[in-house]
């Protein structure tokens, strides 16, 4: 649903129109924004402005992300890498400008091991600070940064 929108980082306003961050911060209270939208060649990803409070195991993370807002979930491995890459194109600054936090924690993805016969207790995590995507026990505790495909 890109519709000729330039790659970049935007804030969705109340009617779901995308506003460039530099325009958004001119508002009386820019911290009213709850999410940013990352537009790339791969699509439009809406990202919560901060991690959910607390730590979660894999199943708890999936549930908490889904309860954040309708349509939200944990990011895929690919989306986590896109978020990391965007840190160097202004994503961290966008979060800060709307009162959020950079996505630099170790968080759950939405993906369990694709071969449950090998290890049904494993799932993928990402390190937002280093860009590392790896494997962890589903019962460990990690952060949750909810995301969603942006819908107008």
Residue ranges of predicted features:
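An exposed tryptophan-centered "aromatic clamp" motif
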Residues: 58-73, 77-138, 147-152
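Extracellular adhesion/carbohydrate-recognition regions
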Residues: 1-72, 105, 109, 119-122, ...
